[in-house]
Amino acid sequence: NICCDIGLVASTLVSGGLAAVEKLHVQPGNPVRAMLAQRLSDAAEILAKLGGRCSAEYKYDGVRVQAHRLADGQIELWTRRLEEISTQFPDVVEVLKEGLGPREAILEGEVVAYDAATDELRPFGEVMLRRRKHGIDQAMQDVPVGLFCFELLYADGEDLTMLPYPERRARLAAAITPGPRLRLTTATEVGEPAALDAAFSQAVTDGCEGLVCKSDGPESAYQAGARGWQWIKLKRDYRSELSDT
């Protein structure tokens, strides 16, 4: 799951055997399979699953991307389905060239339709208008976007995926220079159901889908390709489903 280049895996297996494949590591240019979240609709249940505390991050309504900065300075943007979309978001490429510190890096974030003049998030349908192969310049004018970053998986030769979440978050904060179109996701440490409910309400008020509640314990490594209980989504539609049943 840390290397999606089947050709590289195959050639490594032929030349070095299974032991060599097991030594493959995260590196820019080879997309990492995204860590995924479970979902629940009750704050107390979420906290119980996460050991009583968590980081409640805003769940933005946009396109999740994995951004790779290569050694030559090139920026690649990949979707969670391993589709490269760099040419569709040249403005995101530029803000990363300007605001990302490490010379080589892999980070994850959400590309969101965003009005910097009013500091307002726009609906998901607007950012999807950017998913085109033609008319890119006009699309950038019609639908400006921002990148809200939530993970740093690699920086200047160091694989960060095995670090606990709080350490990755701190490294991410140090790796970017925030600006109008490049920011960290909003996150709040919570330890009580009422506080988690309040964070959820604020996220919705601010135009987000809800929260991604992340374990901040010592074993909160980035689990590439896994849908485990280290991350749990709390979204408006989940609560609506609960109230309707």
Residue ranges of predicted features:
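Electropositive nucleic-acid-contacting surfaces
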Residues: I2-G7, E84-I85, P90-E94, F200, ...
